Amino acid sequence: PLGQRVQIILLDVRYDRNPLVKVTREERAVRKARNMGYYRANHDPAARMLGEDQWGWLERELRKPADLRLIASGTRVLAEETGHEEWANFPRDRRRLFELIGKTAANGVLFVSGDPHFSEYSKIADASVPYPLWDMTSSALNQYNRGKRPNARRVVGPFGEPNFGVIEIDWNAPKPIVHLSTRNLKGATVL
């Protein structure tokens, strides 16, 4: 209905992505002690997470009318300094994503992501976007990680047992309210 339009965008973040850059053997030992992964940011200007056709499609989608936009990514969008697969490994494309959201005046963007085998919520205030961006990470039902990985943008979590995410929208409020929660296998709210 008008005023309650939800747009769901599913990104393919592997098809056109450049290979991840691994750290040196010496760096691995230091990172392992911090529960970090073995990847680092790729600052090559040609390094990309999405291809040009994908960027064009995404811009057209963000220009469509919507009251809330859920952008799903197989890897975390806002997490930083983890050393694992994430958009921060491609800082140029991550910056481009934030700027595209601002340029298209896409309101109500919420990222939903997976991959690290635990749940957490991350948040960033970026000058390109007139509102804070949130990333709800939830995974997985059969593979999980109890270790606490670093993330400079984490505001809630992590929860490292089997889980799933729930998004509820209260359209009756003067401005829609989005409720995020992480549930365990019994359905109990844990985050």
How should each PLM-predicted stretch be described?
Residues 1-191:
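Long, structured stretches of catalytic cores involved in phosphate-ester chemistry, encompassing
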